């Protein structure tokens, strides 16, 4: 969950999409509960805008006075404006720190969740080292989306295409091997 939260913060900076907004709007708590989120949904539909834009437009509304919504908007605006030319790892660290998310996990006391965030940070650094010219936030998010979409288990009946090497250690009720050449698979050396 913490990795998805962290990636949602990055997606919110890049795309301001509804799914990312819904995931992180109240994590850590910003007093944006169900009633306020429903208000934003209705406003967004009525005014044909995103949930994030709805929040930006409604900051002065009485309903959002006792919330930390203004801080969230300020954070997103400031970091997204300055994300060009910055490293993704630096951006990730800053958003986790300034949003209070990392501190939230520390006070929760879950070392495993903090370790997962550290692993995400390391994977971002690894990506940046091998990324070259295409090492932008949007490229990274597209790269990560490929993994999360392909790794997702739909739980539905489906045909999974993979190499023999990728299937090693997995179990399936039925397996079909295509284009076998005698002497190559299985190898004559085995």
Residue ranges and their predicted role:
Residues 4-190:
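Conserved helicase C-terminal RecA-like lobe
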């Amino acid at each position: 969950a913490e990795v998805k939260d962290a990636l949602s913060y990055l997606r919110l900076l890049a795309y301001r999409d509804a799914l990312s907004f819904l995931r992180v709007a109240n994590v850590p708590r910003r007093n944006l509960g169900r009633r306020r989120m429903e208000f934003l949904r209705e406003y967004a539909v009525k005014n044909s805008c995103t949930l994030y834009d709805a929040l930006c437009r409604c900051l002065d509304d009485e309903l959002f006075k006792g919330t930390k919504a203004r801080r969230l908007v300020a954070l997103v605006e400031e970091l997204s404006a300055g994300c060009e030319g910055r490293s993704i790892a630096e951006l990730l660290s800053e958003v986790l720190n300034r949003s209070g998310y990392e501190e939230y996990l520390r006070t929760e006391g879950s070392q495993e969740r903090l370790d997962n965030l550290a692993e995400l940070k390391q994977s971002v650094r690894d990506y940046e080292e091998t990324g070259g010219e295409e090492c932008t936030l949007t490229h990274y998010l597209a790269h990560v989306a490929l993994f999360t979409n392909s790794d997702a288990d739909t739980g539905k009946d489906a045909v999974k295409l993979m190499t023999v090497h990728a299937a090693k250690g997995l179990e399936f009720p039925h397996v079909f091997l295509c284009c076998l050449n005698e002497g190559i698979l299985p190898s004559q050396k085995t």
